[in-house]
């Protein structure tokens, strides 16, 4: 039982046998919790259970939770690779009791696991308790038989946990392992406690109080247990290692990196190998959980992790993208425990490869500037924070990379001046991370939800019904009536109107009675499941308890049904064409169009789009029945049902099934497309009519969007395209079938004419004293200081042709300097200067072109002594720029 996978399984199975429900790890992106950047502890997914918002059928749970600490308050990034126990990604083993067992059984379960199941020697263990927790002190003596000397009272907050300023809190008890007196360090609470001899392996939190205000606590009616054990730490102990990076999992990754780079795992490059191994885990799991590299929020943290690993790859000599070639090794080690890695393997590889390819030039440029700016510094010096910020802000070179690169030379960064520069920039830029919450204006809906309960939805089976008015709202206030002309909202006791949800727009229609008519223009869901009908009273007065006939707009609902069903078919078709990593990131289902956003790292080719469209339309043509069923959420997932990423589902879910699952398309047994969905759908796939994909684009880094039409809109779009093609064919005097060949011939003819025109312009430009020269007021060849100078402003010449013209001029002169300026349509000037070989020792083309660039309003210029180019925004000063070159030659 020494391997990481065996240790994890043993923990879960032990608590499973002791009545705990084995719960899967929640995603690294916390669900419905804007206060957290990433999941950083096992208790995060149970937060609402501990606070009483949610109830669980089983009051005991156990999990191995994926965690990331690389942003915000919990940030281990800078230390990773240089210490034995810092990680950006780690696994937290934990058992939880929600008002069930408490301290005595928690201590008993923990002690039996580590001493009997894991077999740790009792004399190598000691524990800490909160100084005021006499109960825990006594239980450790009674259950574990520990002497007083091995139960250490800690008076500080290290042994008292609280969720926030208010809420559940309680004392902690930590279990430590003694690595032996050959390692420096003392027990917790001693002056030498920061040494590495005694290492915490498990923290037991006894939630027994409710903090109502600072310093004021009341006992909880049902105390709870929350524990956390770092898998990497306990694995190191059980494998006889004092360093987490020496455990089997990390060693397998480090060997894979060493095999690709030739680095020595025990040599000077050990830290870089460890950084890459750790960051590979964090990057891969974040991508698998839907985070993609970007310039803000979670995506920026991921980008920093990836780029830090890439910089260490360069230190190991990697000159091509490295990390993507290591994903297979991670999947081999952790894919069985975390199948999301297997599903997203292709996406992870492609995202890493693209990001490293994009970053390579930035990395090389940034390191070059860093070397240039720090080459005079010595060990103990401080690197200028303003320059560090310029590297970050202008060149995309993160601060931690600057610090990391300078660390080996013993040089630190002036963080204060970096922070000042960052603060100045933030004052001009929008905040990249904000929380979310309901505004005060929304409180009326929560009050109505509390009073009325959930609205009963009838709309899956019907578009008409009768109902009573349960509440009326106008201008954000509850009212007794709505009169003719009033705009407001109506809440009913039941409704067939679908409320906007899951990307599907809400229904419209009419609510009516004798002498009363209310036009519904929008249906929304408020306070969770309160259906709100927004619109205007067209006739009469509507009061509370008024009985109304409800009629959904049938044609509009039908179009929405078709578009929603089409998104499901397109989702499955995309998965089959592009890979299993395809996951929905958002959608819009409207009556006249649909769009579908999904994770994919690169644009989709025209051929791939055609295949997606064809596959989806095959299912439409087969006219299979669309079925829905209610299932337990775990049963639905086991059957292959696809869920919206990050969505939290109840115990029972609605599953929408389309097509037959028996065809050879890799579909599961339930059907061809199987998704958890609460929307409205067609009865048969043939009711969709036709799916026409109209566009594909990027929404954000790593997120693509396709747009499509169905049914009548698709047919109208196709007819319009055919009419346009016929009109174009008529203009070209050919048939629609022959139009591609006709267009190709015209394009070839145009290119030929453009080439001939360009050649004519170049000849005219170099004609010497001709129309072009006269028109621009340019000089002919003249002698300046004994040197021939050809200085001309040329007209109608592409900037890309200037160099070849300068070469021609050098041949014409034999000996001399050639300067040509071309002005673009937007008024910018571009200049190329050439110097013949016999004069290079006297004149540098780079120096001369920079003189001209200054006049044109540009900065610098570059090239070689015999040929250089530059530019500037003020092309109208072409003659002055040429005069500046002449003056420089004259000396």
UniProtKB/Swiss-Prot annotation:
Which compartments does it reside in?
Answer: Cytoplasm
A Gene Ontology cellular component where this protein is annotated is: cytosol
Q: What is its EC number?
A: 6.1.1.7
Record remark: domains: Consists of three domains; the N-terminal catalytic domain, the editing domain and the C-terminal C-Ala domain. The editing domain removes incorrectly charged amino acids, while the C-Ala domain, along with tRNA(Ala), serves as a bridge to cooperatively bring together the editing and aminoacylation centers thus stimulating deacylation of misacylated tRNAs.
Q: Which family does it belong to?
A: Belongs to the class-II aminoacyl-tRNA synthetase family.
Upper lineage is: Bacteria, Pseudomonadati, Pseudomonadota, Alphaproteobacteria, Hyphomicrobiales
Classification via Pfam families = DHHA1, tRNA-synt_2c, tRNA_SAD
- EC class, as a word, reads ligase
Species this protein is from: Rhodopseudomonas palustris (strain BisA53)
Query: What positions does the entry give for Zn(2+) binding?
Result: 564, 568, 677, 681
According to UniProt, the name of this protein is: Alanine--tRNA ligase
PANTHER family linked to this entry? ALANINE--TRNA LIGASE, CYTOPLASMIC, ALANYL-TRNA SYNTHETASE
This molecule's function is given as:
Catalyzes the attachment of alanine to tRNA(Ala) in a two-step reaction: alanine is first activated by ATP to form Ala-AMP and then transferred to the acceptor end of tRNA(Ala). Also edits incorrectly charged Ser-tRNA(Ala) and Gly-tRNA(Ala) via its editing domain.
Q: Which reaction does it catalyse?
A: tRNA(Ala) + L-alanine + ATP = L-alanyl-tRNA(Ala) + AMP + diphosphate
The free-text cofactor remark is: Binds 1 zinc ion per subunit.
InterPro entries in the record: aa-tRNA-synth_II/BPL/LPL, Ala-tRNA-lgiase_IIc, Ala-tRNA-ligase_IIc_anticod-bd, Ala-tRNA-synth_IIc_core, Ala-tRNA-synth_IIc_N, Ala-tRNA_ligase, Ala_tRNA_ligase_euk/bac, DHHA1_dom
Gene name tied to this protein: alaS
Any idea which UniProt keywords this protein has?
Aminoacyl-tRNA synthetase, ATP-binding, Cytoplasm, Ligase, Metal-binding, Nucleotide-binding, Protein biosynthesis, RNA-binding, tRNA-binding, Zinc
Q: Kindly list the GO molecular function terms attached to this UniProt entry.
A: alanine-tRNA ligase activity; aminoacyl-tRNA deacylase activity; ATP binding; tRNA binding; zinc ion binding
State its cofactor: Zn(2+)
* A GO BP entry: alanyl-tRNA aminoacylation
């Amino acid at each position: 039982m020494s391997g990481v996978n065996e240790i994890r399984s043993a923990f879960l199975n032990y608590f499973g046998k002791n009545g705990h429900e084995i719960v899967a790890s929640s995603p690294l992106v916390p669900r419905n919790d804007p206060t957290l950047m990433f999941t950083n502890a096992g208790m995060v997914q149970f937060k609402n259970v501990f606070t009483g918002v949610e109830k669980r059928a089983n009051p005991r749970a156990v999990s191995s939770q994926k965690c990331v600490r690389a942003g915000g308050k919990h940030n281990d990034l800078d230390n990773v690779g240089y210490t034995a126990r810092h990680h950006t990604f780690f696994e937290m083993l934990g058992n939880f009791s929600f008002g069930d067992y408490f301290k005595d059984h928690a201590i008993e379960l923990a002690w039996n696991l580590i001493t009997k199941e894991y077999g740790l020697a009792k004399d190598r263990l000691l524990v800490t308790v909160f100084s005021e927790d006499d109960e825990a002190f006594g239980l450790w003596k009674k259950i574990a038989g520990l002497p007083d000397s091995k139960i250490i009272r800690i008076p500080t907050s290290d042994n008292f946990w609280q969720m926030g300023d208010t809420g559940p809190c309680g004392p902690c008890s930590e279990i430590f392992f003694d690595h032996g007196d050959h390692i420096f360090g003392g027990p917790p609470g001693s002056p030498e406690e920061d040494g590495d001899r005694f290492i915490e392996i498990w923290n037991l939190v006894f939630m027994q109080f409710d903090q109502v205000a600072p310093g004021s606590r009341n006992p909880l009616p049902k105390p709870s247990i929350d524990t956390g054990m770092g898998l990497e730490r306990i694995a190191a102990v059980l494998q006889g290692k004092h360093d987490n990076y020496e455990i089997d999992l990390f060693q397998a990754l480090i060997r894979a990196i060493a095999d690709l780079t030739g680095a020595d795992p025990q040599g000077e490059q050990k830290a870089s190998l460890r950084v890459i191994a750790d960051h590979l885990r964090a990057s891969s799991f974040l991508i698998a959980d839907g985070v993609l590299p970007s310039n803000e929020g979670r995506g920026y943290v991921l980008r920093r992790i990836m780029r830090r690993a890439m910089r260490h790859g360069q230190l190991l000599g990697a000159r091509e993208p490295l990390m993507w070639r290591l994903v297979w090794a991670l999947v081999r080690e952790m894919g069985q425990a975390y199948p999301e890695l297997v599903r997203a393997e292709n996406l992870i590889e492609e995202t890493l490869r693209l990001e490293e390819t994009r970053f390579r030039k930035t990395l090389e440029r940034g390191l070059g500037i860093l070397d240039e700016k720090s080459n005079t510094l010595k060990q103990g010096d401080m690197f200028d924070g303003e320059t560090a910020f310029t590297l970050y802000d202008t060149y995309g070179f993160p601060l931690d990379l600057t610090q990391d690169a300078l660390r080996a030379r013993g040089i630190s960064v002036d963080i204060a001046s970096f922070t000042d520069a960052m603060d100045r920039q933030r004052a001009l830029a929008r905040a990249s991370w904000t929380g979310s919450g309901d505004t005060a204006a929304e409180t009326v809906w929560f009050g109505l939800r509390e009073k009325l309960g959930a609205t009963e939805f009838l709309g899956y089976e019907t578009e008409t019904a009768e109902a009573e008015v349960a509440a009326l709202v106008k201008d954000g206030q509850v009212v007794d009536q709505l009169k003719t002309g009033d705009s407001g909202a109506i809440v009913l006791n039941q409704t067939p109107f679908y409320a906007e949800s899951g990307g599907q727009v809400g229904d419209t229609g009419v609510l009516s009675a004798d002498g009363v008519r209310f036009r519904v223009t929008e249906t929304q869901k408020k306070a969770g499941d309160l259906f709100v009908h927004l619109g205007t009273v067209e006739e009469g007065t509507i009061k509370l308890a008024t009985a109304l006939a409800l009629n959904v707009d049938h044609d509009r609902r039908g179009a929405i049904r078709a578009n929603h069903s089409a998104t499901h078919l397109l989702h499955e078709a995309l998965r089959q064409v592009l890979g299993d990593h395809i996951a929905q990131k958002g959608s819009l289902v409207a009556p006249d169009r649909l769009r579908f956003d999904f994770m994919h790292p690169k644009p989709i080719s025209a051929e791939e789009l055609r295949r997606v469209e064809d596959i989806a339309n095959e299912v439409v043509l087969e006219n299979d029945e669309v079925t829905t069923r209610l299932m337990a959420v775990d049963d639905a997932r086991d059957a292959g049902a696809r869920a919206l990423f990050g969505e939290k589902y109840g115990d029972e879910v609605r599953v929408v099934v389309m097509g037959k699952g028996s065809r050879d398309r890799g579909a599961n047994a339930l059907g061809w497309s199987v998704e958890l969905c609460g929307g409205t759908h067609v009865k048969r796939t043939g009711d969709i009519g036709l799916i026409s994909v109209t566009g594909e684009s990027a929404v954000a880094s790593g997120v693509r969007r396709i747009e499509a039409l169905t049914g009548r809109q698709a047919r109208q779009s196709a007819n319009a395209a055919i009419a346009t093609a016929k009109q174009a064919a008529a203009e070209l005097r050919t048939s629609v079938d022959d139009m591609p060949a006709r267009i190709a011939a015209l394009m070839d003819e145009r290119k030929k004419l453009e080439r001939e025109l360009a050649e004519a312009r170049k000849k005219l430009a170099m004609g010497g004293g001709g129309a072009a020269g006269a028109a621009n007021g340019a000089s002919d060849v003249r002698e300046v200081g004994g040197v021939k100078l050809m200085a001309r402003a040329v007209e109608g010449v592409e900037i890309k042709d200037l160099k070849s013209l300068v070469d021609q001029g050098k041949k014409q002169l034999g000996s001399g300097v050639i300067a040509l300026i071309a002005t673009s349509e937007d008024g910018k000037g571009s200049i190329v200067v050439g110097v013949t070989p016999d004069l290079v020792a006297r004149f540098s083309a780079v120096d001369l072109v920079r003189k001209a660039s200054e006049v044109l309003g540009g900065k610098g210029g570059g090239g070689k002594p015999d040929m250089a180019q530059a530019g500037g925004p003020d092309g109208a000063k072409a003659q002055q720029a040429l005069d500046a070159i002449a003056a420089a030659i004259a000396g």
